[in-house]
Regions:
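Conserved catalytic cores of very large enzyme subunits
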Residues: 1-231
Length: 231
């Protein structure tokens, strides 16, 4: 390896990786795992095809990881945050801001276990029971927190922003509609998620407003990636 070149020059393989000590450590570690993958995981024929450029094997530097993760907020809502190797555990959140903090920390932890993106299902629907009764201004402020907390977390692999996306359905999906809604403190609210459709739409509208406005420099947000579900 050209260790000096890796340390002094920015990573050209992934535009999301900054040029920092953490990033160069990632690049060096990936190089070792790429060699391992070519020698021990793939056949000689496949390895040679990759080296010649006939094919491209993506993310070989993460050969010991699954690619992507997609999960619901419901587990965090019900059980709180208790990460392996963490010196502390948190009970279920009683406030939306605390649930968001759990979500971001969990996403950061998951990013260390997967090679690709960390996705979240029906985010506006899951948060809706926590936002019921809030005014538009409060919901807009929470939407700003949601997007900025993810976009400014340069703590993932190599000091990247967390590669995450948010599923944002226009209406409560069928798989959640008749499910008992979990609210503050991990408790059953006595309602179904379909009863919170108005709250979920208000949050969705607020999130889209924040994306349209951009960050403090009027630049677009690259993360978290919004995925609008229309059906």
């Amino acid at each position: 390896y050209d260790v000096e070149g890796i340390i002094l020059m920015p990573n050209r393989e992934n535009a999301n990786i900054p040029h920092s000590p953490e990033a160069t450590s990632l690049t060096l570690a990936e190089g070792i795992k790429k060699n391992y993958a070519l020698e021990k995981v793939f056949s000689e024929k496949v390895g040679n095809a990759h080296l010649k450029g006939d094919i491209h094997i993506h993310n070989m530097g993460f050969i010991d990881r699954a690619y992507s993760s997609y999960q619901s907020l419901e587990y965090l809502k019900k059980f709180g945050l208790n990460l392996p190797n963490s010196p502390s555990a948190a009970k279920p959140a009683k406030h939306p801001e605390v649930l968001l903090a759990h979500m971001v920390r969990y996403a950061a932890a998951l990013q260390t276990q997967f090679a690709g993106s960390i996705g979240w299902d029906a985010v506006n629907v899951s948060f809706a029971p926590y936002l019921s009764g809030m005014g538009d201004r409060e919901i807009k402020q929470f939407a700003q927190m949601l997007i900025f907390e993810f976009s400014q977390q340069a703590v993932a692999r190599g000091g990247q922003a967390i590669f995450t996306y948010l599923s944002l359905p226009l209406k409560v999906p069928a798989h959640l509609a008749d499910i008992p809604a979990i609210g503050p403190g991990g408790s059953d609210t006595g309602k179904r998620y379909k009863d919170y459709e108005d709250d979920s739409k208000r949050l969705l509208n607020a999130i889209l407003e924040v994306y349209m406005e951009g960050d403090g420099s009027k630049k677009p947000f690259f993360f978290p990636i919004p995925v609008i579900q229309v059906t």
